[in-house]
Design a protein with these regions (language model features):
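Beta1-alpha1 glycine-rich phosphate/pyrophosphate-binding loop at the start
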Residues: 52-109, 202-229
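Short glycine-/acidic-enriched loop or helix-start segments at secondary-structure transitions
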Residues: 66, 89, 133, 169-171, ...
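FAD-site-proximal beta/loop scaffold in flavoenzymes
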Residues: 176-192, 283-330, 340, 347
């Protein structure tokens, strides 16, 4: 008979990975209080000899989606939570079934409560700054070092969920409306422009293509080109045909309105003002691919990490999920990619465990 112990953790976390009081119960509606998360975070990794099956870098929609499945698979997993998620300034979340109009913060809090039901999950509230191969191990493991340098962790598999960082305008009062009157994603918040005066802030590249995405909601669109970018003749002709107004060579310096997200005016450098109800900005972003680069993962021309259908990168045992691997920036896609990576890793771990057990007979 095969002696099969795939569920063993390698650290003291109980025999099942689920609190005994919850075995056999529906855990979907459990509400774990913040104290539980705090205790787990304070119980950071004390023994560097512990080898986790999976290290997840990033605790947004994709990272936590992967974590909850790995918890249910009883896999010893560590999550590195480096701080705010991309949409942490948004007031409401849209397009995610069951969470319409809830806040991203509420969603993340609920996601954490789901994840932290599983004792095989550990949390480190630090940013990972370095990943390298474990030179003392022949099993292709990874060493992860955090910003403080105090936490060095070993893992068999990596899920990188570091996402992207949006470029935001340096405009007076912008912060007051960011996520509440001013947004960047048409698919997430374009509905908010319905039959309203829309101002689009952009540096120019792909401007008209971006503006066209809103025509299903509003035809009252003014595009403000920031900086010195010159539109192509085709863009100008398309804009004129579609009734999209263009303001050039006159950067926005101020947004006026009420603190409740009610925008009233766009004020430009030359003193002119324009009526507006809603702002969308398209100023580019930075792909947070530094760790993927360290590992030698192949990137595309825009800096996104290339992945297979299972979210695996071009480097063995390294997966990339969420906004890091695609320009389809939508929370449903992010969560789905995390689940795909978790399932793929679990299947490979199980396959390897069965193979090793049989070879020992």
């Amino acid at each position: 008979m095969v002696n099969f112990t795939f569920h063993d953790y390698g650290f003291d976390s109980g025999s099942s990975g689920i609190p005994q009081s919850k075995l056999g119960q529906d855990q979907g509606n459990s509400n774990i209080i913040d104290k539980t998360r705090q205790e787990r975070q304070e119980n950071q990794i004390e023994e560097q000899s512990v080898v986790f099956d999976v290290a997840i870098i990033g605790a947004g929609f994709s990272g936590l989606s992967a974590a909850v499945l790995l918890g249910r698979y009883l896999r010893p997993t560590v999550i590195f939570d480096g701080g705010n998620t991309r949409n942490s300034t948004s007031r409401h979340l849209h397009g995610y079934l069951g969470f319409e109009n809830s806040s991203p913060q509420e969603f993340i809090q609920k996601a954490w409560s789901d994840v932290l039901q599983y004792d095989s999950i550990k949390v480190v509230k630090e940013k990972v700054i370095k990943i390298e191969r474990d030179a003392n191990n022949s099993n292709y493991f990874f060493l992860l070092t955090t910003e403080s340098g105090k936490v060095v962790t070993t893992a068999k598999y990596l899920i990188i969920a570091t996402g992207i960082e949006d470029s935001k305008p340096n405009i007076e009062n912008f912060d007051m409306f960011d996520g509440n009157g001013a947004w960047h994603c048409p698919h997430c918040d374009g509905f908010q422009t319905t039959n309203r005066k829309l101002a689009i802030l952009t540096y120019g590249k792909n401007t008209i293509s971006y503006a066209k995405e809103f025509l299903g909601w509003t035809i009252d669109i003014t595009v403000f080109i920031q900086g010195n970018y010159q539109l192509t003749d085709k863009d100008r002709n398309d804009a004129k045909t579609l009734g999209i107004r263009i303001v050039e060579n006159d950067d926005i310096i101020k947004i006026s309105g009420a603190k409740n997200g009610h925008i009233e005016k766009i004020i430009c450098q030359d003193g002119k003002s324009y009526d507006a109800d809603v702002i969308f900005y398209y100023l580019g972003y930075t792909v947070q691919n530094q760790l993927a680069k360290q590992l030698g993962c192949e990137l595309d021309e825009e800096g996104f990490v290339k992945v297979s259908s299972s979210q695996q990168t071009t480097v063995r045992n390294v997966y990339a999920v969420g906004d890091l691997d695609t320009d389809r920036h939508y929370i449903v896609f992010a969560a789905a990619s995390g689940a795909v990576a978790a399932i793929s890793i679990y299947e490979q771990l199980l396959k390897d465990a069965i193979k090793n057990a049989i070879e020992k007979i």
